Amino acid sequence: MEVIPAVDIKDGSCVRLKKGDFNKRRVYSTSPVDVALYWEKHGASRLHIVDLDGAKSGWPTHLKTIREIALRVNIPLQVGGGIRSLKVIKKYLDSGVDRIILGTVALKNPELVKRALDNFGSNRIVVGVDARGGKVATEGWLKTSQVTVEDIISEMEEVGVKTFIYTDINRDGMLKGPDIEGIKRVLKSTKARIIASGGISSRQDLINLKAIGIKAAIVGKALYEGNLPLEVLNQYP
C-alpha cells in the first residue's frame, strides 16, 4: 500500500483542518516547501498537495509555492484546490506537477473533465470525491450537493476517469479511523482505482483499508501528530 502524506496550504502555511472547517485549523509549519522536503527525506513516494485557499475561492492561490515544491522534490506531486480550467491544469502540469485533482468542476462542469482527459490523459487527471453524509461536497467543502458519491463516480467513470480520491469529510482530521463501510460501498460501485482519505489514525486503519482492496491512502494528521511512525512511508507493504 502506498501511504501518501498530505500537505494542505492555507495562508502560506502548512495546516490541518478538522472536518474541513476553515475556522478549526492547526498550523504545522510556515514553510510548505520544508514540509514537502521532510516527507520526501523520510521515504514518501508521492505527495498530496491541496491549495485550501484556492479550493475556497475557485482560483489557485499558491501556484508559486507549489511550483517551488515541484522544483525542489524528486517525487511525484498530485495537486488539487481551485483547479477549474484547462489553462490552470496546463500551468500546474508545466510546473512539474504529476497529477491534477479535479473536485468541484467534476460536479459543475463534467464536460471540462472530459476535455482534460482528452488533452492530458487519465494518468494525469483524477477526480476528488469529497463526501458528507454520502453526498458530494464542493467549493472547498463549504457546500453540500444532493448528488450521491456513487452517482458522481459513475458519471465520471463514463467520461474516462480511472482514479478517484474518496474523502469522508466528517472523519478528516479527527483521527477516528476511516469509514470502512462507506469505502466498501464505493469499491462495489466502480472498477476504478480508489485512493482513501480521511480519519486514518493508526497502522490498524491501514491494515483494514488494505484488507478491503485499497492500494493507496492519503494521511495527514496522523503523520503530523506522530500517531503513525515515519516508517509507514517506505516500509508499509
Swiss-Prot record:
Say which domain of life the source belongs to: Bacteria
Molecular function (GO) terms listed? 1-(5-phosphoribosyl)-5-[(5-phosphoribosylamino)methylideneamino]imidazole-4-carboxamide isomerase activity
Q: Which Gene3D superfamilies does this one have?
A: Aldolase class I (3.20.20.70)
**Which top class of enzyme applies to this chain?**
isomerase
Active-site feature positions: D8, D130
This protein's major location comes to cytoplasm
The cellular location(s) given in this protein's UniProt record come to: Cytoplasm
Q: Does the keyword Amino-acid biosynthesis apply?
A: yes
Q: Which GO terms describe its biological process?
A: L-histidine biosynthetic process; L-tryptophan biosynthetic process
Q: Which GO terms describe its cellular component?
A: cytoplasm
Catalytic reaction annotation: 1-(5-phospho-beta-D-ribosyl)-5-[(5-phospho-beta-D-ribosylamino)methylideneamino]imidazole-4-carboxamide = 5-[(5-phospho-1-deoxy-D-ribulos-1-ylimino)methylamino]-1-(5-phospho-beta-D-ribosyl)imidazole-4-carboxamide
Which pathway features in its UniProt record?
A: Amino-acid biosynthesis; L-histidine biosynthesis; L-histidine from 5-phospho-alpha-D-ribose 1-diphosphate: step 4/9
| EC annotation from Swiss-Prot or TrEMBL | 5.3.1.16
Against InterPro entries, the record matches this protein to: Aldolase_TIM (IPR013785), His_biosynth (IPR006062), HisA_bact_arch (IPR006063), Isoase_HisA-like (IPR044524), Isoase_HisA-like_bact (IPR023016), RibuloseP-bd_barrel (IPR011060)
Similarity comment: family membership? Belongs to the HisA/HisF family.
Q: Which PANTHER family match?
A: 1-(5-PHOSPHORIBOSYL)-5-[(5-PHOSPHORIBOSYLAMINO)METHYLIDENEAMINO] IMIDAZOLE-4-CARBOXAMIDE ISOMERASE
User: In its UniProt entry, what is this protein called?
Assistant: 1-(5-phosphoribosyl)-5-[(5-phosphoribosylamino)methylideneamino] imidazole-4-carboxamide isomerase
